[in-house]
Amino acid sequence: MSRLAIAAVTLMASAATYAAEPIALRDMGSFHVGGRLVEISGKPVKDVTFTPGGVPAKVDPNGTYQVEQMYVQYFLPQNEKGAYPLLLWHGGGLTGVTYETTPDGREGWLNYFLRKGWSVYNSDAVERGRAGWAQYPDIFKGEPVFLTTSNPFQRFRIGDGPDSYDPDPAKRKLMPGSQFPNAGYENFVKQNVPRWTTTDDATIAAYIAEIDRVGPCIILFHSQAGTFGFKVAQARPDKVKALIAIEPAGVGDPAKVDALKNIPTLMVYGDYIERDSRWPKIRATGGAFADAISAAGGSADVVDLPKVGIKGNSHMMMMDKNNAEVAGLIQTWLEGKGLTKK
């Protein structure tokens, strides 16, 4: 077993004591960032009754709207040990809840890294959660995409193949040795929110605005945010000190890979990649981009968790039962790159 895997196991063994220890903060808060103003005209004025039994009010939809902003909540530990703030970016159809807690009520990565002394900035991206979304098709083009309860069960490599989901947890067909907390799956899908496929440019602009406000930072991003994380780093290479890509569904601009050569990069992939028709291609795309970073003179480490003895992880590894073990591997990598304070 590699040094990273051994260290991760040690960290997992001590993680059980965390819940009894309070988290000491020097500050916490939130802000919105990014966005733009848009004019809408030519719409009819309507009478709207906002509250049952209330008095109707005239609502004129014509005018200026604030849209495409992003919400960020930050937590600053009393005893800061990270050399730079850690930004957490969620994946598609999700929000910052991804990192807050697990479907079965355990601590998420937000708390894990806070306890390790990192200042953590957790966001709801454009058109997600507390960022809000805009009218469509007037502003957002196309319709939002909604997922059924069963869709992520197979697509996120929790269930083993088609028809693996069942409303009864006991009847579900899980991947063999799955670490996902099956009994809490419905709590996970309650986190799912509508997503658009036409807002990438706005999302990248908002993430750039976040970095411009926060300053030099480390970005940990998941799934859909793979494209955002790499492209934002390519746009602000002087402000990004490390990239941690958790099963990135997309990558950056191959023509601008040189911009990443001074940014240490870690890619992490879970289990069962070969058991799903989509994931081998996604994994190959990420690996090829890591190779391109290395060829440009950069540092890109790719970790397939089963190969270092960490097995059973789904696409949602930050929620899996061994999430502290995976976080420990990331923490060890950050320490090895000199990104913690002495």
Give residue spans per PLM region.
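Conserved acidic catalytic loop of the alpha/beta-hydrolase fold
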Residues: 197-218
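Active-site glycine-rich loops that stabilize anionic/oxyanionic intermediates
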Residues: 90-102
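Conserved alpha/beta-hydrolase
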Residues: 106-132
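Gly/Ala-rich beta-loop-alpha elbow adjacent to hydrolase catalytic centers
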Residues: 220-229, 233
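N-terminal cap/lid segment of alpha/beta-hydrolase-fold proteins
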Residues: 20-81
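Short beta-strand element of the alpha/beta-hydrolase
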Residues: 82-92
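Catalytic active-site module of serine/aspartate enzymes centered on a nucleophile-bearing elbow/loop
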Residues: 310-312, 316-342
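The feature captures the conserved acid-bearing segment of alpha/beta-hydrolase catalytic domains
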Residues: 245-305
